[in-house]
């Protein structure tokens, strides 16, 4: 709320760094609401940070000096990667890097359950899925094959008849 922002600003020391996690309040608007305070950053943390594999884009305000930037980025290192991005793209990164896993986690868990139902131990199911997922991502993004060629590498695709409907759901959800 505006009053909470004003109250928070009153407590800020001049040498403080404020890192906003607010999704829609850009650095310029935040600086205005904070009475011109410019030692600002805005970031998009994501859930995979809990295993130090986060991809947490950050926008650094123009008023944030180099030493404060370095200290903030060092503080965030244990979370995973923290690429500096333009403030205008934070929401886009939120959709891809923060919400992206939610498109897949339930499917990964369903595959794990199937693997166990077919006889794999929980540990073997987990290890198999982990290796398969890493390999699948690397095949799609590092093989230099087109996405169509990658998807054609496996002759049997159990969800082939549902792919168009799934893509339609993704299109509807992103609007």
Predicted regions and their residues:
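Polar/charged alpha-helical tracts
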Residues: 10-11, 66-70, 74, 161-164, ...
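A short, flexible low-complexity segment enriched in Lys/Arg and Gly/Pro that occurs
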Residues: 18-24, 70-79, 163
């Amino acid at each position: 709320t505006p009053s909470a922002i004003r109250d928070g600003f009153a407590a800020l020391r001049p040498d403080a760094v404020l890192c906003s996690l607010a999704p829609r309040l850009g650095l310029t608007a935040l600086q205005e609401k904070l009475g011109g305070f410019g030692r600002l950053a805005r970031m998009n943390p994501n859930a995979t940070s809990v295993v130090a594999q986060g991809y947490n884009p950050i926008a650094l305000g123009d008023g944030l000096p180099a030493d404060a930037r370095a200290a903030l980025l060092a503080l965030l290192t244990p979370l995973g990667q923290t690429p500096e991005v333009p403030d205008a793209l934070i929401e886009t990164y939120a959709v891809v890097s923060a919400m992206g896993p939610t498109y897949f986690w339930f499917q990964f868990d369903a595959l794990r359950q199937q693997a166990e139902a077919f006889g794999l131990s929980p540990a073997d199911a987990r290890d198999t899925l982990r290796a398969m997922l890493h390999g699948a991502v690397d095949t799609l993004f590092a093989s230099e094959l087109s996405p169509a060629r990658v998807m054609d590498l496996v002759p049997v695709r159990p969800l082939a008849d549902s792919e168009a409907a799934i893509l339609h759901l993704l299109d509807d959800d992103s609007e």
